[in-house]
Amino acid sequence: MIPDAPILRRSRRLILTLLLPLLAWMGATLALADDREQRDLVDQSRMTLSNFLADTNMTWFRDHIQDAKGLFIVPQYMKGALIYGAAGGSGVFVAKDEKTGEWSEPAFFTMGAASFGFQFGAQMSEVVLLVLTQRGVDSLLLGNFKLGADGSVAVGPVGAGVSGATTPNLSADLLSFVRAKGLFAGVSLEGAALISRDEWSRAYYGKPVSPTDIVIRREVKNPHSETLRAEILRAIDRK
């Protein structure tokens, strides 16, 4: 016997009522899975900043982070070499609104470099760039930035005996700070390319956005990044 139309309609409504919460849960789960790498990078960036603030060799960094117009953070900058060398890592860029003092949502980038000449070894580093000038901010927002060419970079003062009064090359657009372990004596970022990862920003914010959309126009938000921005404010307030 075939059920009559009213019974069929009620059955369909019941099925839809039961399915909608399940579909909503599945959609949320898939969204979390889709941006898992991006969320991990934001979390790692917060940890890197926390590591820098706790490092006794980063006195100057702690004393001057409030002067930065922007921060570029790479939690894992890997370098390896056997005659020829290559280095790279993913990072985030955030900038400060000069009027309100509020920090932007993170834009996603990759940083990479190649080197030549005899070299051997491997190294993992944490990198933070203090962006000191508007030129540095604007160049990064273009999404394809080369350190030393599109903006000047200098090595920031590092060491337990370095006081906040020590003056580095403040004419540079960016100051680089590196915490490294490995067989290399040091890490040079001169010539490294910083390229926006628009597909990562899309995954994190759920729609296509450029670095300018994120950092300047502030068209998107992701509550997950609140912990990173809170860590930046904590760093500034502790001064």
Placement of each model-derived feature along the sequence:
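Bacterial N-terminal signal peptides
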Residues: 16-27
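Small-residue-enriched, tightly packed secondary-structure blocks
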Residues: 34-239
